[in-house]
Amino acid sequence: MKIKIPLIIFIFFISILFFGLFIETKLIQSPLIGKKLPNYELVELNTGYKSDIRMLPRETFLLNIWASWCLECIREHNTLTIINEDKKLKIVGVNYKDKREDALGWLSIYGNPYIYNIYDYTGELGLDLGVYGVPETFLVDKNRVI
């Protein structure tokens, strides 16, 4: 009996770990769907000028959270570059928890599909957006609703 209880507990935790590996995290929906973008006060990545929600487009746009240290961001960046070619849908970037010089270097290597880039060096805006990890992309309407 003494061996059965620890064995059952062990099997239980291994089962949780095993099933956790197969949960598709890309299918996790944002709790902000249908809600307005949060206000923020940060800086623009390229210029260092103050940035807030008033600087964002008043039309439908993509909001892409990315970082230079994110390998998956390179693959998504290629897709964003293709989307940007016809200029029909504007893309705003949020550089997340990154070093400014690394982010600017990354954009010079891979190209810059963004009309505007918010520098979220502390992750404050990402936290307000409920970011699980980078990259994440939100479709935002003209009323700034996700």
Task: State the predicted function of each range.
Residues 74-111, 121-128:
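Structural microenvironment flanking redox-active thiols in thiol-disulfide oxidoreductases
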Residues 40-61:
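A short beta-strand-turn-helix
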